[in-house]
Regions:
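Post-transcriptional modification and biogenesis factors for structured RNAs
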Residues: 1-161
Length: 161
């Protein structure tokens, strides 16, 4: 089995079970170290998650935290840098990030309507956003996860070998 990337996704009160399943599937595709499910985010076993994840919820390590801030604090103690994926003052465009392959990273994705909890944004080491040029200025959570994870995986040395 190939080694896991030093990369974790934190789902902060994501309400759609299809989004949760899709993130599991993407986490499996990029060999992430794990997924943290927080607050109202659904957790396996659930039929709706399984349908979208196609079983990836069994191949990706995951843990549940009632409070997303507790997840961030636990990951920080484990040596992770925390990035909120959110459009906030001071957020950096994804394409401008330069990551170190020797560092562990956690990406926090927020609720479909409210985004990342403000206390989590405040506790994050940085915020990153996907530049957008349309009128909506928002993407589906699982689509955002795929875009950001691709860039992080590429910079952290994801290989097809």
């Amino acid at each position: 089995e190939a080694p896991k990337l030093p990369l974790v996704v934190v789902l902060d009160n994501v309400r759609s079970l299809h989004n949760v399943g899709s993130v599991f599937r993407t986490a499996d595709a990029f060999r992430l170290s794990g997924v943290c499910l927080c607050g109202i985010t659904g957790r396996p076993p659930m039929v709706e998650i399984h349908k979208t994840a196609l079983g990836a919820e069994d191949s990706v390590d995951w843990e549940y935290f009632e409070d997303p801030l507790a997840a961030v604090e636990a990951l920080r103690r484990r040596g992770y840098l925390i990035f909120a994926v959110e459009q906030v003052a001071g957020s950096r465009p994804l394409h401008q990030l330069r990551l170190s392959p020797d560092q562990k990273y956690a990406l926090v994705l927020g609720n479909e309507v409210k985004g990342v909890t403000q206390s989590v944004v405040d506790a994050s080491d940085a915020a990153v956003e996907i530049p957008q040029y349309g009128t909506k200025h928002s993407l589906n959570v699982s689509v955002s996860a795929g875009i950001v994870l691709w860039e992080f995986a590429k910079q952290l040395g994801f290989s097809y070998e």
